[in-house]
Amino acid sequence: MQVQLREYHKSDFNELEGIIRQTWHYDEFASPKIATKLARVFLTSCLTNYTFSRVAVMNGKVVGIILANNIAKHKCPFSNRFAQFKAILSLLLSKEGRNVSKIFGNVHGIDQQLLDENNKKYPAELALFAVSSECRGKGIGKMLFQSALEYMKQEKLDSFYLFTDTSCNYGFYEHQGMERCVEKEHIFNIKGQRANMKFFIYEYLLSVA
């Protein structure tokens, strides 16, 4: 198994879109077309919010990504903002897309509530972390996480945070030494089914020499 870590390239987008669609189970509550658009909105949004990227490539195939953001240094290129705008607009053009987007509007609101309740200012954020389900348990997630930690240390950032929830493997973050700070429960109505989810903020404190 040969794994290479490198910076994000635009040519990685489609493969990463597929990983995100699979990781966040978009097909469980949306048609395939809308699931693809949701993944595109999510990925383009994350790509407006980073200063460091590492993509994992195994045997020539993209299998994971991590994005970290040094908030003080962050500047988003206009092209990334425009890509996000186009993705959101495309989602909102259909009735199904508009209905599904309400769920994600709720999630954004919950994340903001978590930040407000946590009442801490962090110099950095882990903006995106995803690994293909085919490659989990092979140490790729740990490699990506360690690369982000090295970046934080080089930048002399003493802490960072991330948002996660019960749809993700949030136990991974605890194994990497992150601490859960706050949590919030929310019930969604998806396709007539009640879905109970918990949302968290995790933090990591670094010793910066």
Regions picked out by a protein language model, each given a short descriptive name:
Residues 142, 154, 166-183:
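Conserved active-site alpha-helix within GNAT-family acetyltransferase domains
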Residues 2-18, 70:
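A short beta-loop-alpha structural element at the N-terminal edge
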Residues 127-129, 133-136, 161-171, 187-190:
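Conserved beta-strand-loop-alpha-helix junction that forms the acyl-donor binding cleft
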Residues 161, 179-196:
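Conserved catalytic-core motifs of GNAT/GCN5-like acyltransferases
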Residues 123-124, 152-165:
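Conserved GNAT acetyl-CoA-binding A-motif
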Residues 72-124, 189-195:
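Conserved acyl-donor/pantetheine-binding loop and adjacent beta-alpha core of acyl/acetyltransferases
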Residues 137-150, 175:
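Conserved acetyl-CoA-binding loop-helix of GNAT-fold acetyltransferases
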Residues 43-55, 71-76, 125:
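A short helix-loop-beta-strand connector motif used in the catalytic cores of GNAT acetyltransferases and
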